[in-house]
């Protein structure tokens, strides 16, 4: 082991700024106003951006594009981003966050998947025709009632799994580089690139990030920047674990927006606390399984009802629950499902 591997946080560019994100810190609320004036006036702050400063699409999402880049009307979970700051140091950026004033009108909270389906449950996304239901996945095979009639024994149980943190070793880190960046303007080079014989000059907006889906990152960043995908480059650095937790956008778009706004490289590194707060988790589930079997061990029928808690935004929920539903019988041949 040489210890020479470089992850996103190991890259340093001349003239680089450091970014932080102002989170909602309330689970469900309408935004009445956002005041960033004091943060903008703090010495060492180079940019403070809100939803009004996004030149392109103010939303991202791998499957459903429903997650705001920066919230301007409403927040739907405590980790929602409302404003981003780029400053000379991470400490100055953090101090600027404390100066951003947000006036919220807090709303009722829905905290689990079953409660979310109640007729009087608060709607997280008012524009969705099915309320809080993202997708209803149906699997049908054979005749379940005939299968249970042929069973000698029926087991009917409800199982629950909790929300699970992926807990990768490396917290999220993104570095945005503006198009036409020239490091010599700041009197230096990027050592990590020089070691590979690469120039630190960039002809398009570039994002360095440890990501599981870099091409999706490119397309979503381009949409937010209001440019074509071929005008954005994503460099997938080595990744200190992901396990599904680095599929969604976290700091990639924010770093790119700040880089273009300041015309300087911008690094956004999450603390462990922020990482735990922000990224999507493995779904909490409630699973009712009714299984029929004969005394000689043959499964005659399975009836499964699964509820998955996708949280505030779709992420990969419909894919995860499609997999869970189609695998509900496990590795067994069951004629009636």
PLM regions with names:
Residues 2-337:
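Structural alpha/beta core scaffold segments of enzyme domains
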